[in-house]
């Protein structure tokens, strides 16, 4: 026998409730159903570190003091949600650090930073529930209580300011104002969000994400067409000195289009050494000199190794060596001695490029680079996930 739909069954049961509870229960059921039916949303809106949603609540009308949602991410650090009645004196933040949940609180009763629970950055959906009971805060992950903080809060009805703002996917003050700062942007998807009490909600504003959670995702770093990032050469592992050598390793997944993959240079002259994607090949060039190309084999690491007089591009058993002109070698080595030396990834600012590509990883001198620590980058870069097909990354539907 087919199982009856959840909402009609619950509505039927509501008819048996006393009239005094009828309207409250009906609103609760409908709010729960809306949360379950709503599609997953991406926690980064492409506008920087701003929240994807800000809700305002009247605490004097609050009946339900809990929030719940499901989260999927490969990102180990960022803000899930933040709430305050005063950004200076009374605020709360739930985020991830090293993949595990972290709560930060600052109010007249408690000032604390606590991490607890399992890692959530495994790419699976995890159910998270935050409850306020009297003066305590409870955190549940996948149905298990992982943290209970007692004597850390007054009741919500006793707050000096009766209005609370709740921000999803960001903060309402600078990250430096956190007790222990972290990178706010969290590359992840959230669904079935239920935030405090819908009956007490006064207003809501949203910034639609330009990323889709409907496409099949996998871990990695995704560069949509025209996006870029740059690292200062002084902030990444340094070349070997005797003899001089520097290497970059990329695990490149199937890509689309043509355009720049990476470059070494300065903001004024970024073309000292460049790698371009072109017709399923990579083309290595130095300055205005003719380049060489290497057909790509997906699934094998691509390595660029710089020596005293050559730049060697290799993948598996295939290898191409580009001789560096004597006049060009000195400036290339000097890149590491000046503060303007840069490693550029993706298109240069203002450069026309149709290339979209995903990196499974990027290593300098054998050490993995963290895109969250780039000197600057396009906000549309997916720092910890990739669509299974590069063409799906520009889908803005949810």
Swiss-Prot record:
Q: Which keywords does the record carry? A: Disulfide bond, Glycoprotein, Lipid-binding, Repeat, Secreted, Signal, Steroid-binding
What is the superkingdom listed in this entry's lineage? Answer: Eukaryota
- Listed transmembrane segments: none
Q: List the disulfide bonds.
A: 189-213, 358-386
The terms under GO molecular function for this entry are:
steroid binding
Span of domain Laminin G-like = 41-213, 220-386
Q: Where in the cell is it found?
A: Secreted
Q: Mainly resides where?
A: secreted
GO CC entries: extracellular region
Glycan-bearing residues: 376, 392
Q: Does the keyword Endoplasmic reticulum apply?
A: no
Record SMART domains: LamG
For this protein, the record's InterPro entries field holds:
ConA-like_dom_sf (IPR013320), GAS-SHBG-PROS (IPR051145), Laminin_G (IPR001791)
The signal sequence is: 1-31
Quaternary structure (record): Homodimer.
Function summary: Functions as an androgen transport protein, but may also be involved in receptor mediated processes. Each dimer binds one molecule of steroid. Specific for 5-alpha-dihydrotestosterone, testosterone, and 17-beta-estradiol. Regulates the plasma metabolic clearance rate of steroid hormones by controlling their plasma concentration.
* Stated name of the protein: Sex hormone-binding globulin
């Amino acid at each position: 026998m087919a199982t009856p739909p959840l909402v009609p069954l619950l509505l039927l049961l509501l008819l048996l409730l006393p009239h005094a509870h009828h309207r409250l229960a009906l609103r609760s059921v409908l709010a729960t159903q809306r949360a379950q039916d709503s599609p997953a949303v991406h926690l980064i809106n492409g506008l920087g570190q701003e929240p994807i949603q800000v809700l305002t609540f009247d605490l004097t009308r609050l009946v339900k003091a809990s929030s719940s949602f499901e989260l999927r991410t490969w990102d180990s650090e960022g803000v899930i949600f933040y709430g305050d009645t005063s950004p200076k004196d009374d605020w709360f933040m739930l985020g991830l650090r090293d993949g595990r949940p972290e709560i930060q609180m600052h109010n007249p009763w408690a000032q604390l930073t606590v991490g607890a629970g399992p890692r959530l950055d495994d790419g699976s959906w995890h159910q998270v529930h935050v409850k306020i009971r009297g003066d305590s805060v409870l955190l549940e992950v996948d149905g298990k209580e992982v943290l209970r903080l007692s004597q850390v809060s007054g009741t919500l009805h006793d707050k000096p300011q009766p209005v609370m703002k709740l921000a999803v996917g960001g903060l309402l003050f600078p990250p430096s104002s956190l007790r222990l700062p972290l990178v706010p942007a969290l590359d992840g998807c959230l669904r079935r969000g239920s935030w405090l009490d819908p009956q007490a909600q006064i207003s809501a504003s949203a910034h639609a994400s330009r990323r889709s959670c409907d496409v099949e995702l996998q871990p990695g770093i995704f560069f949509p067409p025209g996006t870029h990032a740059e690292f200062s050469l002084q902030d990444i592992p340094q070349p070997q000195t005797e003899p001089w050598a520097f290497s970059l390793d990329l695990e490149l997944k199937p890509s689309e289009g043509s355009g720049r993959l990476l470059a070494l240079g300065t903001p004024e002259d970024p073309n000292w050494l460049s790698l371009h994607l072109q017709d399923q090949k990579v083309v290595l060039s130095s300055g205005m000199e003719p380049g060489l190309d290497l057909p790509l084999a997906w699934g094998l690491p691509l390595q660029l190794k710089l020596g005293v007089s050559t730049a060697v591009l290799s993948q598996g058993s295939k290898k191409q060596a580009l001789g560096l002109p004597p006049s060009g070698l000195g400036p290339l080595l000097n890149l590491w001695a000046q503060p303007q030396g840069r490693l550029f990834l993706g298109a240069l600012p203002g450069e026309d490029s149709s290339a979209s590509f995903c990196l499974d990883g990027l290593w300098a001198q054998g050490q993995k680079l963290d895109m969250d620590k780039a000197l600057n980058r396009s906000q549309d870069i997916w720092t910890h996930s990739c669509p299974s097909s590069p063409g799906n990354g520009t889908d803005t539907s949810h």
